[in-house]
């Protein structure tokens, strides 16, 4: 663990001084007039205590790093960016936690269980004597929690400085970068979109179009971490999408805390962005739109319906309702009523036939009565949502909802079970059997028995494992359905179709290593040169050469002192007393 602890929130790492450094008065003390005192019995000490070359564990840039991410797509994108930067600087990203020298734990603050897993991982890392760097919404929102003391933290808007934090942590320092990025006093969306990254799936690019939101939901802790809305400019988002397609990506996910609010802070809106993006989506690729709250999409229903009907945009939208009780929604400060939600869903179902609407529901929010809950049950029974995320309410520290009178735990648990039972009482895909569909194959199933594809409505379709299908559009006949999936058999005369998509990067390969970025690395004291691949430890090697040269110098000094001691040892005492 770090040898120095620091709970001060810093703007720059340069302000850190390790406990191993000399004290100021020691550094200023001059020894030029001091003659070494000779002790004959300790003559061999000079030879025995020679300086040693630095060990691999303290030379930044050559260690193995394990990255664990919890939470939403936005958080996963942040994790991919941090992995890419670390790999570009010479670190080895490993999937083996026990083999790693440092753990980078990227947290989620939405639910208590996610934070519990995060806390347990910190404890395990400490037990295994791993270096630790913390990231994500938990330490950003509450950096002074007891279990975070003495640990390095990288803020959600500072992920472009992850290399600095990791390097200092490896040296034994505890550093924290939690500030917001601003330009002329205006808050920026966060780190640059053109940073290198390692995609968890080389075929899928996750693009955060904005950070933060405009709401103040009484149960939400994420707002404490991500802050108010800050949108990325359209041209930067379009450029990132184009670069992704050039690297073989065939599916783009747009994500944020609320995609529907995009652009309100920079004088634009979500439909304007989407129309620009569909212009650059190649044939054979698809775009998936992330979560949007009802109030903001209400203003753009006509345009959104047109976009969701586009052949290269999934007819899918995630619209959280949270409760079907207006009184509960008011207590949540959700800024809409149930009628608004129904209006959005009904309009899109009419204008975008077959559209998939996913939603979220919280069971047992403070003040929720049995009647309130029954209203929510009726909503699920009416719309039969094919994708429903049911969450038992957990009070998050520091939120208004945590201070309210709580629904008894056993009641919350029972309501969660009851709603889950309603959800599992219907199968939304039975009517799809016998259909012929075009699907995009992007990954392997968890049990490794199938490839996972998605149809036009972002419904999961399992297909046979044929390597020729991966990353391609394939035509299949649907022959089976389950609660969360369909199964498709490729049509015998089908042709694999993706003529306009480049060959994807290999798994674990760093994306975004443009010439401009390589030049920036070359100018950085710890960077990789333009001619050195990211997989080589160029920066680490140069630092090791420097430290070894310092070691050689120290060795020469020690040898000189030892010879001087020997000379004085055999020198006649009479000459010393003259």
UniProtKB/Swiss-Prot annotation:
Q: Transmembrane segments in this chain: where?
A: 553-570
Q: Which InterPro entries does its entry note?
A: Elp3/MiaA/NifB-like_rSAM (IPR006638), Methylthiotransferase (IPR005839), Methylthiotransferase_CS (IPR020612), Methylthiotransferase_N (IPR013848), Methylthiotransferase_N_sf (IPR038135), MiaB-like_arc_euk (IPR006466), rSAM (IPR007197), rSAM_horseshoe (IPR023404)
The reaction(s) catalysed by this protein are: N(6)-L-threonylcarbamoyladenosine(37) in tRNA + (sulfur carrier)-SH + AH2 + 2 S-adenosyl-L-methionine = 2-methylsulfanyl-N(6)-L-threonylcarbamoyladenosine(37) in tRNA + (sulfur carrier)-H + 5'-deoxyadenosine + L-methionine + A + S-adenosyl-L-homocysteine + 2 H(+)
One cellular component term (GO) for this entry is:
endoplasmic reticulum
Q: How does it sit in the membrane?
A: Single-pass membrane protein
Ranges of residues in domain TRAM: 430-492
Keywords recorded for this protein, A-Z: 4Fe-4S, Endoplasmic reticulum, Iron, Iron-sulfur, Membrane, Metal-binding, Phosphoprotein, S-adenosyl-L-methionine, Transferase, Transmembrane, Transmembrane helix, tRNA processing
Database matches in Pfam families = Radical_SAM, TRAM, UPF0004
List each copy of the Radical SAM core domain by range. 199-430
User: Enzyme class, one word?
Assistant: transferase
Protein origin, superkingdom: Eukaryota
Q: What is its main location?
A: endoplasmic reticulum
The cofactor note reads:
Binds 2 [4Fe-4S] clusters. One cluster is coordinated with 3 cysteines and an exchangeable S-adenosyl-L-methionine.
Q: What does this protein do?
A: Catalyzes the methylthiolation of N6-threonylcarbamoyladenosine (t(6)A), leading to the formation of 2-methylthio-N6-threonylcarbamoyladenosine (ms(2)t(6)A) at position 37 in tRNAs that read codons beginning with adenine.
Which protein is depicted?
Answer: Threonylcarbamoyladenosine tRNA methylthiotransferase
Record the organism. Mus musculus (Mouse)
Its gene is Cdkal1
């Amino acid at each position: 663990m770090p040898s120095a602890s620091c709970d001060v929130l810093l703007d720059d790492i340069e302000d850190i001084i390790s406990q191993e450094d000399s004290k100021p008065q020691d550094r200023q003390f001059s020894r030029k007039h001091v003659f070494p005192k000779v002790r004959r019995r300790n003559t061999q000490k000079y030879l025995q205590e020679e300086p040693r070359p630095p060990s691999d564990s303290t030379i930044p840039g050559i260690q193995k790093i394990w990255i664990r991410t919890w939470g939403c797509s936005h958080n996963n994108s942040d994790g991919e960016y941090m992995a890419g930067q670390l790999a570009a600087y010479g670190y080895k990203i490993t999937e083996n936690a026990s083999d790693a020298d440092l753990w980078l734990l990227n947290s989620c603050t939405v639910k208590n269980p996610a934070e519990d897993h995060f806390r347990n991982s910190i404890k395990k890392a400490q037990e295994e004597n791993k270096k630790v760097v913390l990231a994500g919404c938990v330490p950003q929102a509450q950096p002074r929690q007891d279990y975070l003391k003495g640990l390095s933290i990288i803020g959600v808007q500072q992920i472009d400085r992850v290399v600095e934090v990791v390097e200092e942590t490896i040296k034994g320092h505890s550093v924290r970068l939690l500030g917001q990025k601003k330009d002329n006093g205006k808050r920026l969306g966060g780190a640059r979109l053109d940073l290198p990254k390692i995609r968890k799936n080389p075929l899928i690019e996750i693009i955060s179009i904005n950070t933060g939101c405009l709401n103040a939901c009484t149960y939400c802790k994420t707002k404490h971490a991500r802050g108010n809305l800050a949108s990325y400019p359209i041209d930067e988002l379009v450029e990132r999408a184009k670069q992704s397609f050039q690297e073989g990506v065939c599916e783009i996910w747009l994500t944020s805390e609320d995609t529907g609010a995009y652009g309100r802070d920079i004088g634009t809106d979500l439909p304007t962005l989407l129309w620009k993006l569909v212009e650059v989506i190649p044939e054979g690729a698809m775009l998936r739109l992330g979560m949007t709250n009802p109030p903001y999409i209400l203003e753009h229903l006509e345009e959104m319906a047109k976009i969701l009907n586009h052949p290269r945009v999934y007819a899918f939208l995630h619209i959280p309702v949270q409760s079907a009780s207006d009184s509960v929604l008011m207590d949540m400060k959700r800024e809409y009523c149930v009628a608004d939600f129904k209006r959005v869903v009904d309009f899109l179902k009419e204008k975008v036939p077959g559209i998939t609407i996913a939603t979220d529901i919280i069971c047992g929010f403070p003040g929720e009565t049995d009647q309130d809950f029954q209203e929510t049950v009726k909503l699920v029974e009416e719309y039969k949502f094919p994708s429903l995320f049911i969450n038992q309410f957990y009070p998050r520290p520091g939120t208004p909802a945590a201070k309210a009178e709580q629904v008894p735990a056993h009641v919350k648990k029972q309501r969660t079970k009851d709603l889950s039972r309603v959800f599992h009482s219907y199968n939304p895909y039975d009517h799809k059997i016998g259909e012929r569909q075009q699907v995009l194959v992007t990954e392997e199933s968890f049990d490794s028995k199938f490839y996972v594809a998605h149809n036009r409505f972002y419904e999961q379709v399992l297909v046979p494992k044929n390597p020729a299908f991966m990353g391609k559009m394939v035509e299949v006949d649907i022959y089976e359905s389950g609660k969360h999936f369909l199964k498709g058999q490729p049509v015998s005369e089908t042709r694999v179709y993706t003529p306009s998509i480049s060959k994807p990067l290999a798994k674990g390969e760093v994306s975004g290593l443009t010439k401009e970025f390589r030049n920036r690395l070359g100018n950085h004291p710890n960077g990789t040169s333009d001619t050195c691949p990211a997989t080589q430890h160029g920066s680490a090697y140069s630092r090791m050469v420097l430290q070894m040269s310092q070691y050689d110098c120290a060795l020469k000094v020690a040898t000189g002192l030892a010879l001087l001691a020997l000379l004085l040892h055999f020198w006649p005492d009479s000459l010393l007393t003259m």
